[in-house]
From Swiss-Prot:
One term of GO molecular function: structural constituent of ribosome
BP GO terms, sorted: translation
Gene name linked to the record: rpmB
Family as reported in the entry's similarity comment: Belongs to the bacterial ribosomal protein bL28 family.
Any one GO CC term of the record: cytosolic large ribosomal subunit
Keywords linked to the UniProt accession: Ribonucleoprotein, Ribosomal protein
Official protein name in the record: Large ribosomal subunit protein bL28
InterPro entries per UniProt: Ribosomal_bL28 (IPR026569), Ribosomal_bL28/bL31-like_sf (IPR034704), Ribosomal_bL28_bact-type (IPR001383), Ribosomal_bL28_sf (IPR037147)
Amino acid sequence: MSRICELTGKGRQIGHNVSHANNKTKRTFLPNLQNVTLLSDALGKSVKLRVSTHGLRSVEHNGGLDNWLMKTGDDQLSANARKLKKEVAKKLAEKAA
């Protein structure tokens, strides 16, 4: 299972451990990923995702999964999130018509 957020696309970063003597050794910084089930109001079902805590806070701040997907540009979304956004947009268009 890859260590990438399914909503934001946030992944691992590479850096250094730095000792007191300023010796540098390579290390990786991993995102804090959580397995969550988010409810989509438009689709009327729950969606299981592996999301970073930063992504989860963003979703809650914007008032839910559907609102967050609609407000976020496609260039900032991962492939799974773009697919989910397309489904939500289609359902919202059907409800509006």
